[in-house]
Protein backbone atom coordinates (compact mmCIF):
# COMPACT_ATOMS: atom_id res chain seq x y z
CA UNK A 1 0.00 0.00 0.00
CA UNK A 2 1.35 3.39 -1.00
CA UNK A 3 2.05 5.95 1.73
CA UNK A 4 -0.63 8.36 0.54
CA UNK A 5 -3.34 10.32 2.37
CA UNK A 6 -6.77 8.75 1.83
CA UNK A 7 -8.49 12.16 2.05
CA UNK A 8 -6.17 14.79 0.55
CA UNK A 9 -3.96 12.63 -1.70
CA UNK A 10 -0.75 13.94 -0.12
CA UNK A 11 2.21 11.62 -0.75
CA UNK A 12 6.01 11.47 -0.70
CA UNK A 13 7.82 14.23 -2.57
CA UNK A 14 11.35 13.99 -3.99
CA UNK A 15 14.10 16.58 -4.20
CA UNK A 16 17.74 17.24 -3.38
CA UNK A 17 19.84 17.75 -0.28
CA UNK A 18 22.40 20.47 -0.93
CA UNK A 19 25.77 20.48 0.83
CA UNK A 20 27.76 23.62 1.60
CA UNK A 21 29.58 23.07 -1.73
CA UNK A 22 26.15 22.81 -3.43
CA UNK A 23 26.58 19.12 -4.25
CA UNK A 24 23.21 17.45 -4.75
CA UNK A 25 22.07 14.13 -3.32
CA UNK A 26 18.56 12.77 -3.73
CA UNK A 27 16.19 12.71 -0.76
CA UNK A 28 12.48 12.41 -0.06
CA UNK A 29 10.01 14.31 2.10
CA UNK A 30 7.26 12.16 3.57
CA UNK A 31 3.81 13.48 4.41
CA UNK A 32 2.86 13.36 8.11
CA UNK A 33 0.54 10.35 7.80
CA UNK A 34 -1.31 8.73 10.69
CA UNK A 35 -3.07 5.36 10.53
CA UNK A 36 -6.61 5.94 11.80
CA UNK A 37 -9.98 4.20 11.77
CA UNK A 38 -12.64 6.11 9.87
CA UNK A 39 -16.03 5.31 8.36
CA UNK A 40 -15.79 4.40 4.67
CA UNK A 41 -19.16 3.59 3.08
CA UNK A 42 -20.64 3.21 6.56
CA UNK A 43 -18.04 0.67 7.71
CA UNK A 44 -14.97 1.28 9.88
CA UNK A 45 -11.68 0.98 8.00
CA UNK A 46 -8.03 1.65 8.89
CA UNK A 47 -6.48 4.11 6.44
CA UNK A 48 -3.57 6.55 6.29
CA UNK A 49 -4.70 10.16 6.79
CA UNK A 50 -2.49 13.26 6.87
CA UNK A 51 -2.22 15.16 10.15
CA UNK A 52 -3.44 18.27 8.35
CA UNK A 53 -6.68 16.52 7.33
CA UNK A 54 -7.20 15.37 10.93
CA UNK A 55 -6.57 18.85 12.38
CA UNK A 56 -8.83 20.61 9.89
CA UNK A 57 -11.73 18.26 10.65
CA UNK A 58 -11.98 16.76 7.16
CA UNK A 59 -12.21 13.31 8.75
CA UNK A 60 -13.73 11.96 11.97
CA UNK A 61 -12.22 9.04 13.88
CA UNK A 62 -14.37 6.03 14.79
Curated annotation (Swiss-Prot):
Gene3D superfamilies: Ribosomal protein L28/L24 (2.30.170.40). Pfam families: Ribosomal_L28 (PF00830). GO terms for molecular function: structural constituent of ribosome. InterPro entries: Bacterial_rp_bL28, Ribosomal_bL28, Ribosomal_bL28/bL31-like_sf, Ribosomal_bL28_bact-type, Ribosomal_bL28_sf. Keywords: Ribonucleoprotein, Ribosomal protein. GO terms for biological process: translation. It comes from the Bacteria. GO terms for cellular component: ribonucleoprotein complex; ribosome. Belongs to the bacterial ribosomal protein bL28 family. This is Large ribosomal subunit protein bL28. It comes from Bacillus velezensis (strain DSM 23117 / BGSC 10A6 / LMG 26770 / FZB42) (Bacillus amyloliquefaciens subsp. plantarum).
Amino acid sequence: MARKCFITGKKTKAGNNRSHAMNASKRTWGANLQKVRILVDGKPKKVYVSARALKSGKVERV
